Amino acid sequence: MSKRTEDIVIIGGGPAGLAAALSARKAGCEKVLILERDRELGGILNQCIHNGFGLHTFKEELTGPEYAERYIDMAEEAKIPYLLNTMVTNISLLPDGRKKVIAINKEDGLLEIETETVILAMGCRERSRGALNIPGSRPAGIYSAGTAQYYVNIRGRMPGKNVVILGSGDIGLIMARRMVLEGAKVQCVAELRPQSGGLKRNIVQCLDDFNIPLYLNTTVAQIHGRDRVEGVTLTKVDDNGE
């Protein structure tokens, strides 16, 4: 087991983790370490190839990968160390109040890191179909927007050609446009609430400009198909989603 001591360990090398590391270094902390489970830094930004990032921070419009690259460059200029392909398996509290982080990767094997502070910057997870309580069987062809975005933008694979999107947050709107640009037919975007959860400009640029209908107070009541999705039944709901 390899052992090391740090002042701050940041779990997650996406935009939040990189920003936290840079802020810690600017505040005078020298022993900062980023642990990232993926093979590269940048997190979710690497699959967000649309523009719209960086206006507040860099005063110019960037794509997700460009925005991530700016932060990665700043972290490397600040000589902030990071470990890739590294999975954290445990965090525990030591008797003196410090924390012990256990992590593992192929190069170092098992790592034991003692640190004053642990910053959790692992991002978030999308709600699954199960969490949304949509009735029906479990055929192929059901994806979260982030997974579909990963397949299209990173893997170069289309998850389908006839699409219904449930949820009108920004990623749902952006993926509606992306699927059309890749040749799919987006039947509609359904939104449970009485208003869209996305920015107005995304509604205009991603839906209106591509003639994609937005159905408010609408959700998926049933999924049809056994081996693969064959269709869905949409239903209207009230403002409380019932």
Language model features: what each stretch is:
Residues 37-40, 50, 87-88, 123-125, ...:
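Short, ordered loop/turn segments at secondary-structure junctions
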Residues 1-11, 69-162, 238-241:
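FAD-binding core/adjacent interface of flavoenzyme oxidoreductases
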Residues 6-70, 74, 160-202, 213:
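Beta1-alpha1 glycine-rich phosphate/pyrophosphate-binding loop at the start
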Residues 23-24, 107-110, 153-155, 175-178, ...:
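A generic local secondary-structure boundary/capping motif
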Residues 58-72, 112-117, 213-223, 242:
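Short, basic, helix/turn surface patches
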Residues 21-22, 69-72, 116, 143-149, ...:
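Predominant activation on well-ordered alpha-helical scaffold segments within soluble catalytic domains
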Residues 75-103, 180-242:
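A Rossmann-like FAD-binding core segment of flavoenzymes
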